[in-house]
A protein has these predicted regions:
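Alpha-helical solenoid repeat scaffolds
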Residues: 18-131
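Classical Sec-dependent N-terminal signal peptides that target proteins to the secretory pathway
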Residues: 1-19
């Protein structure tokens, strides 16, 4: 649903997303449309690569937030942790925390780092409480 709403916004305006008071050029709007087309196709890896080429933090964070909100993705514990730490005002933070907790792999992440995370962040899922 979120993807559809953002897509509608992008398709119905010539100036979308502002960064440092510089509006997107028509070329960047077209690139952004292309990114959302890739997302609709489920091609997240290409969408994320194209996002980096536009070089706009707002758009990059938005696309990455949409990606992280998907239950099935290739993000790991650190991807979630870094995003949540750097983007404290983004919506759906409890759900991102929930997904982060399900990405904990004790074979890849040291006990110390897991303990440190939960000292700073209260678990939101039973899975997180077990860790």
């Amino acid at each position: 649903m979120t993807i559809i709403l953002v897509g509608i916004l992008l398709f119905n305006t010539t100036y979308v997303l502002s960064d440092n008071k510089n509006n997107f050029s028509k070329n960047k709007v077209e690139q952004t449309r292309s990114i959302f087309k890739q997302i609709e196709k489920g091609n997240w890896s290409l969408a994320l690569r194209k996002t980096k080429k536009i070089n706009n933090k707002i758009l990059s964070d938005l696309i990455y937030w949409l990606y992280l909100n998907k239950k099935k993705n290739n993000a790991d514990f650190y991807d979630y942790q870094n995003f949540i730490t750097q983007n404290t005002n983004f919506p759906n933070k409890p759900y991102l925390q929930y997904l982060l907790e399900h990405k904990i792999n004790t074979e890849l992440i040291s006990s110390k780092k897991i303990i440190n995370h939960f000292e700073k962040n209260k678990p939101v899922s039973s899975f997180g409480k077990l860790r």
